[in-house]
Regions:
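N-terminal leader/capping segments at the start of a protein or of a new domain
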Residues: 1-66
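Conserved metal-binding segment of the jelly-roll/cupin
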Residues: 122-142
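Conserved short histidine dyad/triad with adjacent acidic residue
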Residues: 71-95
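Structural signal for conserved beta-strand scaffold positions within catalytic alpha/beta enzyme cores
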Residues: 38, 70-73, 150
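A short secondary-structure junction signal
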Residues: 111-114, 119-121, 140-141, 160-162
Length: 176
């Protein structure tokens, strides 16, 4: 189940609120320019190729208006899962929107907005658009299973700018 847990940066052990209804999650995040929605699933065969996954959601991708898309797959048997997890746990910003659609699995995107942290557990059929410049990090868990579409403004993609803030170490991760 998708949820958002809202924390004060002063109390990383206890969320101020936890929301599980999609409408509540949407409105809470929309107050900060973050877009969250659920897409209708498209039929995909087990073992679908990247091209098949992109084709299955082509209408939705086109409607968003981004120029490039890639499929990101990380599972528990990925040879670099530990390195990838550690890398994504560093707080970062991007000069363009961070756009992810979950085809399968789950992950925890955590946004640092002012004096609050919004931990959003995304799962299959969730779309998340984090506006450019919003500090955030991502936890795929110790035994990851996530397949996402990542959308970009340009074919070159986007390079993160690490903030150097170690705030992510203070807040619960996906497995906590």
């Amino acid at each position: 189940m998708s949820y958002v847990a809202v924390y004060s940066i002063a109390t990383p052990d206890t969320p101020n609120k936890v929301l599980t209804h999609a409408d509540d999650i949407q409105s809470t995040l929309a107050d900060h320019g973050v877009r969250f929605e659920r897409w209708q699933p498209s039929p995909l065969e087990k073992g679908a190729t990247d091209a098949q996954m992109i084709a299955a959601y082509q209408a939705q991708i086109k409607a968003l208006g981004y120029a490039a898309v890639e499929v990101v797959r990380v599972t528990q048997d990925h040879p670099q899962k530990d390195e990838l997890r550690a890398q994504f746990l560093d707080e970062r910003t991007y000069s363009e929107d961070e756009v992810r659609f979950f085809i399968a699995g789950q992950g925890l995107f955590t946004l640092h907005i002012g004096d609050y942290v919004y931990s959003l557990r995304c799962e299959k059929n969730d779309l998340l658009i984090i506006p450019a410049g919003v500090p955030h990090w991502f936890d795929m868990g110790e035994n990851p299973h996530c397949v996402t579409l990542r959308l970009f403004n340009t074919a070159q993609g986007s390079v993160p700018s690490l903030t150097g803030n170690e705030i992510a170490t203070r807040f619960p991760g996906l497995d906590d």
